[in-house]
């Protein structure tokens, strides 16, 4: 366990290597997070003209959670926090934020870009390992662009349902799960874009009720 600025970075469950990475560009992103203040990220994005840098550092990403009705007291668990693209939106409204991510490099990027925050803790490791050590109950648990990877990290016959069952154990009685995932009829497809993982049009989840 160590600190980057005020942020606690807990590597108790980290297995020593990053299994999910964008490659060498992450070294460049780490240098940006270390040496560039967030108010200058847009300038760097314009200069670099790099999709990963735009994707991970654009403040527009935070809009996906800007609607959440925070009062400043909530405890939030962000699963799959990556480089912290939406962590700032949570820190801006909630009382405490705990992040979980599989990648040490991405967690370091997240910690450096939010190093002034005194209410952020980042737990590095596979969710199935980390969640066994969670002692808190949360008002909100977020899965932003993460739920579709459940099959890769939840070892069971029905990984997506079991993923939700595991998460529910860590909610307060009136807590809520917030999921953002590709919508097969989303505006991006009507604009001609393809799905990120398969490269096809109109690919994604259909709205349905899952009993957990």
Predicted features along the sequence, with ranges:
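Conserved class I S-adenosyl-L-methionine
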Residues: 73-82, 178-201
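Class I SAM-dependent methyltransferase SAM/SAH-binding core
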Residues: 93-129
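Conserved small/polar residues in nucleotide/adenosyl-binding loops
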Residues: 210-212
């Amino acid at each position: 366990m160590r600190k980057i600025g005020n942020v606690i970075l807990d590597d108790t469950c980290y297995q020593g290597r990053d299994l999910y990475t964008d490659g060498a560009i992450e070294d460049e992103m780490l240098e940006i997070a270390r040496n560039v203040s967030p108010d200058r990220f847009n300038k760097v994005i314009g200069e670099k003209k790099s999709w990963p840098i735009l994707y991970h550092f654009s403040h527009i990403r935070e809009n996906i959670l800007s609607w959440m009705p925070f009062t400043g007291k909530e405890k939030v668990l962000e699963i799959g926090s990556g480089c912290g693209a939406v962590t700032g939106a949570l820190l801006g409204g909630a009382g405490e934020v705990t992040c979980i991510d599989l990648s040490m490099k991405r967690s370091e990027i997240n910690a450096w870009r939010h190093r002034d925050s005194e209410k952020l803790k980042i737990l590095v490791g596979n969710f199935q390992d980390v969640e066994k050590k969670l002692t808190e109950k949360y008002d909100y648990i977020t899965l932003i662009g993460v739920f579709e990877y459940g099959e890769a990290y939840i070892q069971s016959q029905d990984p997506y349902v079991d993923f939700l069952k595991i998460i529910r154990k860590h909610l307060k009685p009136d807590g809520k799960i917030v999921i953002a995932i590709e919508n097969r009829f989303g505006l991006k497809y009507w604009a001609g874009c393809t799905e990120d993982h398969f490269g096809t049009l109109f690919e994604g989840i259909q709205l349905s009720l899952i009993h957990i």
